[in-house]
Amino acid sequence: MTKKLSKRMQAAIAKVDDSKLYSPLEAMELLKETATAKFDETAEAHIRLGIDPKYSDQQIRTTVSLPKGTGQTVRVAVLARGEKVKEATDAGADIAGSEELIEEIQKGMMDFDVLIATPDMMPKIARLGKQLGPRGLMPSPKGGTVTADLAAAVNEFKAGKLEFRADRTGIVHVMFGKASFSADDLLANLKALQETIDRNRPSGAKGRFWRTVFVSSSMGPSIPVDINALRDLKFEDN
């Protein structure tokens, strides 16, 4: 049985013209207007790319530093040894440890949003695949989460650095702020995301790379964005 849409959602959907491609700024303004839930909704982008991720040369997994931040408190955990544990804690890591932290994670402790590891810890982390893999939390060099420079990594992820990847159908789902952000700030973050994807275009991608871009608040309707206008946009961060 089809679930009946709430009056709130019906009113939000009515504001979106599905036959139209919205300019990037219009789309941000409409996202804010249709974010009518009783909490500060997350701004989400859903980007369909012309790739087939089953081929290794058509995959995207990388990071973006959102210039206006994520609007969220990011909990960072670090796996390291010796002095590196203190370095991570001093840099602001919420949790830091070595073998004992691995054991806690194995037992189900997942009280973090990002897991960073030093390269020497990776052989031991391999056994955490069952816990970390399904949540996309396994540290990786491509994701910027395997590094010896823990202070820089902790600070970047705390400040608004996000890891993202294309799913098996070639779609990138990623948050880029909060509905309470100004339209200009949301646009600055979306532009940074677009530029990051273009810089990391897989070598095996053929034909039209950008297919569709939709944005929405977490409880709002999808809003189609004019891809060419977004890519042509020269955004000056004041």
UniProtKB/Swiss-Prot annotation:
InterPro entries recorded: Ribosom_uL1_bac-type, Ribosomal_uL1, Ribosomal_uL1-like, Ribosomal_uL1/biogenesis, Ribosomal_uL1_3-a/b-sand, Ribosomal_uL1_CS
GO molecular function terms listed in the Swiss-Prot or TrEMBL record: rRNA binding; structural constituent of ribosome; tRNA binding
Gene3D superfamilies linked: 3.30.190.20, 3.40.50.790
Keyword match Ribonucleoprotein: yes
Highest taxon, organism lineage: Bacteria
A GO-annotated cellular component: large ribosomal subunit
UniProt function note: Binds directly to 23S rRNA. The L1 stalk is quite mobile in the ribosome, and is involved in E site tRNA release.
Complexes and interactors: Part of the 50S ribosomal subunit.
Protein name per its UniProtKB record: Large ribosomal subunit protein uL1
Origin species: Synechocystis sp. (strain ATCC 27184 / PCC 6803 / Kazusa)
Gene: rplA
